[in-house]
């Protein structure tokens, strides 16, 4: 798993959390 993919996944999780 590349670091970029990890950050991308983390960013998406943060966006989802802000949506709540």
Swiss-Prot record:
Its ancestry begins with:
Bacteria, Pseudomonadati, Pseudomonadota, Gammaproteobacteria, Moraxellales
Q: How does it assemble?
A: Homohexamer. The oligomerization is ATP-dependent.
Is the keyword Repeat assigned to this protein? yes
Which gene name does the record give? clpB
Highest taxon of the lineage: Bacteria
Signal peptide coordinates: none
Q: Please provide the record's free-text comment about the domains of this protein.
A: The Clp repeat (R) domain probably functions as a substrate-discriminating domain, recruiting aggregated proteins to the ClpB hexamer and/or stabilizing bound proteins. The NBD2 domain is responsible for oligomerization, whereas the NBD1 domain stabilizes the hexamer probably in an ATP-dependent manner. The movement of the coiled-coil domain is essential for ClpB ability to rescue proteins from an aggregated state, probably by pulling apart large aggregated proteins, which are bound between the coiled-coils motifs of adjacent ClpB subunits in the functional hexamer.
| Stretches for region Repeat 1 | 6-20
What protein name is recorded for this chain?
Answer: Chaperone protein ClpB
Tell me the compartments it is located in: Cytoplasm
User: What keywords appear on the UniProt entry?
Assistant: ATP-binding, Chaperone, Cytoplasm, Nucleotide-binding, Repeat, Stress response
Family according to the record: Belongs to the ClpA/ClpB family.
**Predominant localisation class:** cytoplasm
Q: Where is the Clp R domain?
A: 3-20
What this chain does, per the entry, is described as:
Part of a stress-induced multi-chaperone system, it is involved in the recovery of the cell from heat-induced damage, in cooperation with DnaK, DnaJ and GrpE. Acts before DnaK, in the processing of protein aggregates. Protein binding stimulates the ATPase activity; ATP hydrolysis unfolds the denatured protein aggregates, which probably helps expose new hydrophobic binding sites on the surface of ClpB-bound aggregates, contributing to the solubilization and refolding of denatured protein aggregates by DnaK.
Q: What induces it?
A: By heat shock, primary alcohols and monocyclic aromatics, and weakly by catechol.
User: Which Gene Ontology CC terms are recorded?
Assistant: cytoplasm
Question: Where would you find the membrane-spanning parts of this chain?
Answer: none
Query: Where are the disulfide bridges?
Result: none
